[in-house]
Amino acid sequence: MAVLTDDQVDAALPELGGWERADGALRRSVKFPAFLDGIEAVRRVAERAEAKDHHPDIDIRWRTVTFVLVTHSEGGITEKDLQMAREIDEILDR
């Protein structure tokens, strides 16, 4: 799978809710009403990631959860990352 150019990633960002390109990865931070709401969202994302065999880096800070996507085996952002970002958006926006 080919690494996307910065222009390709930037063109996809408007359709992704709250994602940004930072340090060679896609990143989205979400603030939840309560700590356990964030943990539940992480659980749902983890289930989908496991099913797709494409796992985001996840950072949990009290009520804020940050998801980071990059295809490590390819050394950059690929279409797999864009697709997983869409799926994370779908899970979080339910």
From Swiss-Prot:
Classification via Pfam families: Pterin_4a (PF01329)
SUPFAM superfamilies the UniProt entry points to: PCD-like
GO biological process: tetrahydrobiopterin biosynthetic process
Keyword Lipid metabolism: no
GO molecular function, one term: 4-alpha-hydroxytetrahydrobiopterin dehydratase activity
EC number: 4.2.1.96
InterPro entries cross-referenced by the UniProt entry: PCD_sf, Pterin_deHydtase
Cited Gene3D superfamilies: Transcriptional coactivator/pterin dehydratase (3.30.1360.20)
Catalytic activity as recorded in UniProt: (4aS,6R)-4a-hydroxy-L-erythro-5,6,7,8-tetrahydrobiopterin = (6R)-L-erythro-6,7-dihydrobiopterin + H2O
UniProt keyword annotations, A-Z: Lyase
Record has Endoplasmic reticulum as a keyword: no
Family listed: Belongs to the pterin-4-alpha-carbinolamine dehydratase family.
PANTHER family the UniProt entry points to: PTERIN-4-ALPHA-CARBINOLAMINE DEHYDRATASE
HAMAP family associated with the record: Pterin_4_alpha
Name used for this protein in its record: Putative pterin-4-alpha-carbinolamine dehydratase
Taxonomic lineage: Bacteria, Bacillati, Actinomycetota, Actinomycetes, Mycobacteriales
